Amino acid sequence: MSIEVHAVSKSYGIQSALNEISFSAKKGEIIGFLGPNGAGKSTMMKILTGFILPSKGTVFVSGINVLKNPIEAKTHIGYLPEQNPLYEDMYVKEYLQFQASIFKVSKEVTTTVIKTVGLMPEVHKKIGQLSKGYQQRVGIAAAIIHNPDVLVLDEPTTGLDPNQIQEIRTLIKELGKEKTILFSTHIMQEVEAVCDRVIIMKKGELLIDKPINELKKSNEQIIEVTFDYKIEEQFIQRLPNMITFKNNFDNTWYITFDSTED
């Protein structure tokens, strides 16, 4: 597996950002990380890429323990954070050659990557002169400059116009033919357009992990219920058409029902 996440939790004091998250991904999969703001998507991505540590759990990328060998693991990871960290006063080619030098990549590879992401027409411009869509392409180019096995993209289409969104989606699908891609968004239509599989999160919990085609066929419905008082599991188990349930915290439950019958 390219990505293996085992029982990862992250807390900030008494606030839980992630609760026992586990999933895996194989080469060539594009996985959509779907959820509202505050679901824990960015936190999980920062842990996966070695930028923050989990409170507990383990993470492996290309068989390397990210927590024990973060520097080695990062050579296998390309990461585009939500806030694209670009040097706007640098020229496109200059910036990407600088990124390549960090990984000791040749100038020839830099040119190939520039062509791959469609930056040739803009290569002699300063990054600050580019549109948001082309700036995202620069960020993606920097993320793949060292030919990583895993590409982590945190909301890469946010703030783009419809044409730019379509262009970035097409680029991601092309890159996904050879790499494992984890792609976060809060728009379901985007997941359907780009991804093979979806992981749905809410309030630090993993609610669904399914292939897109299975999710479309599914008659399951998940609801979040907060009771006024403590409820025993036996009560939940007796609910009609109940498939699964999970106690999130206190008196709040996530309950999955078969919605074939009203």
Positions of PLM-derived features:
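ABC transporter nucleotide-binding domains
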Residues: 2-3, 10-202, 206-208
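ABC transporter nucleotide-binding domain
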Residues: 167-258
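Short, charged/polar, Gly/Pro-enriched secondary-structure boundary elements
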Residues: 260-262
